[in-house]
A protein has these predicted regions:
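Active-site acidic Asp-centered loop
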Residues: 28-30
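Catalytic cores of eukaryotic secretory-pathway lumenal/extracellular enzymes that build
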Residues: 100, 140, 147-155
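Short, glycine/acidic-enriched loop or turn micro-motifs at the edges of active sites
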Residues: 32-34, 109, 145
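Long helical/loop segments within the catalytic core of UDP-sugar-dependent glycosyltransferases
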Residues: 1-22, 36-121, 132, 153-154
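Short aromatic/hydrophobic "clamp" motif used to bind/position activated sugar donors
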Residues: 25
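Catalytic donor-sugar/metal-binding loop of nucleotide-sugar-dependent glycosyltransferases
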Residues: 119, 128-146
Length: 155
């Protein structure tokens, strides 16, 4: 990462974008465990899609969801978001507020939008809204990425 005052994830993503060469850019967090065939599903869904579809959002889940009360609460929130809210927004044709991981986007669309907003801590949701505003579409990917839920009790 080059030196500078702004030290955010979106700035790091923009920096890495300059080194990318593929047509599809994927964003996964270091602790993520995507399904083994997730990249194949991404390639297939993009290959069969309308050209206006430029972004796919995978489902997130936790591999330690049943560890304690707190992890179950996190799992319940993710289940509501990824199985109810996002599919509902997609069916209604609304903009999808993207998540910061398990997200895949056509490089050309990202370049046209000038990348991520380096000053925005909700750069992922912002990107989904900016894509929608320009007439481009996001869709849900039928694939799961697991991560670890915070397991520390409240007290």
């Amino acid at each position: 990462m080059p030196k500078g005052r702004v030290k955010t994830k979106p700035r790091a993503l923009n920096f890495a974008l300059g080194f990318s060469r593929g047509d599809i850019i994927g964003v996964l967090d270091a602790e993520d465990a995507p399904e083994k065939d997730q990249l194949l599903k991404v390639a297939n869904q993009f290959a069969l899609a309308d050209p206006r579809l430029v972004c796919l959002q995978g489902r997130l889940d936790f591999y330690n969801a049943h560890r304690n009360w707190l992890t179950r609460c996190f799992a319940l929130e993710y289940a509501a978001w990824f199985h109810v809210m996002l599919p509902g927004l997609a069916r209604l044709g609304f903009a999808l507020p993207l998540g910061g991981t398990s997200m895949y986007i056509r490089r050309s669309a990202l370049i046209d939008l000038k990348g991520w907003d380096a000053f925005n801590v909700t750069e992922d949701a912002d990107l989904g809204l900016r894509l929608s505003r320009t007439g481009l579409r996001c869709a849900l990917l039928d694939s799961k990425t697991c991560e670890e839920a915070t397991k520390m009790p409240l007290m």
